A protein has these predicted regions:
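Divalent metal-coordination and catalytic microenvironments
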Residues: 81, 107, 134, 145, ...
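A mobile, often basic/glycine-rich helix-loop segment
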Residues: 173, 203-224
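C-terminal accessory domains and tails appended to enzymatic cores
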Residues: 2-9, 13-29, 43-51, 55-60, ...
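Short, well-ordered beta-to-alpha junction loops that form the rim of enzyme active sites
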Residues: 149-151, 196-200, 206, 242-245
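Active-site environment of divalent metal-dependent phosphoester hydrolases
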Residues: 83, 110-113, 199-206, 248-250
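Proline-aspartate-enriched helix->loop->beta-strand connector
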Residues: 178, 182-200, 208-211
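Active-site rim/loop-helix segments in enzyme catalytic domains that contact anionic ligands
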Residues: 2-9, 14, 18-30, 38-189, ...
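Residue-level recognition of the N-termini of beta-strands and the immediately preceding loop/turn
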Residues: 101, 192, 235-239
């Protein structure tokens, strides 16, 4: 296993040397372009944007720790900020427990709007800002982070058949190219457990739907020596989970608990949208619930780090966390694939994995 060298020698204070150290950690194709990007770590992006050396060192240290830990978890998301709104407390908990955690962002979120009304930002600034925001969120969660390198497709209204997706974006490229890119990262970090979205993407965003396709494809191909032989030595993850963050049962339970205290339900409009949707409630598919109430404050801090993407006065933060902990103190998942024996329901994503790894 090749780790990212942590900057210790004097020569590593040179940004060019440190950037080469990061690049050397990946087995990458000889040619990179918009349709065949090279995955890169937070530290490489921070160097490119002129970030303080302490931030770079911290990112490299988290990356090395994620590779060397005896148990390893990879969370695959569509955009920066998704990791902080979907399963963030789980990532923080496992990181605090000594699990090596790496987040993979399939795109850079370049087409995201500025959702914080307090900010006035030119659209040209968004890509660099989102790099910094993601680095801060990763530091708060205690996780490593990898950019898969594809371009954001942007959100599109209406049914999928009406979408006019931009050329060269994540949602329209050949999925095989994207799967190979993620297989390369899986084989580098060797996770025992992976998390991503279900086939609906969690909500109808083309990048979220494609993230599901790519994540499942990589889980199934990474351990096959005949699949993508140039993407590094094979490694087979043992379990794949889908995030179930916004089940109707969870949102309704929290909403009614707040209403009992205040007379108002912060999620009333959200619940109405649920009733208008044709797709089934993902909550009916929950198999695994991880107790993470002690890390809700970490989750919130990580989400606030994405300041262009979240209004600090939004309903995301309208629920008292002690009340949320009492009503629904877990983050929820659907076990989609398992190559180890386990008993459902679970309270640990590593159920069955710990025994296999230690044997």
């Amino acid at each position: 296993m090749v780790g990212v060298p942590h900057a210790q020698a004097d020569s590593n204070r040179d940004p060019k040397v440190r950037a080469q150290n990061v690049s050397d950690a990946f087995s990458v194709p000889d040619v990179a372009d918009a349709e065949h990007p090279v995955a890169h770590t937070d530290s490489e992006e921070l160097i490119a944007t002129g970030a303080d050396s302490a931030l770079v060192d911290a990112a490299q240290a988290r990356d090395e720790a994620a590779r060397l830990a005896p148990l390893r978890l990879m969370a695959v998301h569509a955009h920066p900020d998704d990791e902080s709104s979907k399963g963030a407390a789980t990532l923080a908990k496992y990181s605090a427990d000594g699990v090596g955690v790496v987040v993979v962002s399939c795109t850079g979120g370049e087409r995201g709007d500025v959702l914080n009304k307090k900010l006035t930002i030119d659209s040209a600034e968004i890509p660099a800002l989102r790099i910094r925001e993601m680095a801060r969120a990763a530091e708060i969660l205690g996780v490593a982070h990898v950019w898969l390198g594809f371009h954001d497709t942007g959100y599109h209204e209406g049914p999928p058949e009406s979408w006019d997706l931009p050329a060269g974006s994540f949602g329209v490229l050949d999925p095989e190219v994207e799967i190979e890119a993620l297989v390369r990262v899986v084989r580098q970090y060797r996770p025992h457990v992976m998390t991503t979205y279900d086939e609906s993407g969690g909500y109808p965003h083309p990048d979220h739907i494609r993230c599901h396709v790519v994540s499942v494809g990589a889980f199934e191909a990474a351990g096959d020596p005949d699949a993508y032989p140039d993407a590094g030595p094979p490694w087979q993850p043992l379990k794949l989970y889908y995030n179930v963050g916004f089940s109707r049962s969870r949102i309704t339970a929290i909403n009614e608990a707040v209403r009992e205290q205040t007379g108002e339900g912060p999620y009333d409009e959200w619940i109405k949208r649920f009733s208008d949707q044709a797709r089934p409630d993902p909550g009916t598919r929950i198999t695994s619930q991880v107790a993470v109430a002690d890390y809700f404050h970490v989750r919130d801090a990580a989400l606030r780090a994405h300041e262009t993407q979240i209004d600090p006065d939004s309903t995301w933060f309208a629920v008292p966390r002690d009340l949320e902990a009492q009503v629904w103190g877990t983050e929820d998942y659907e076990l989609a694939r398992s190559l180890v024996d386990t008993t459902l329901p679970e309270d640990d994503l590593f159920a069955g994995v710990r025994e296999k790894v230690s044997s």
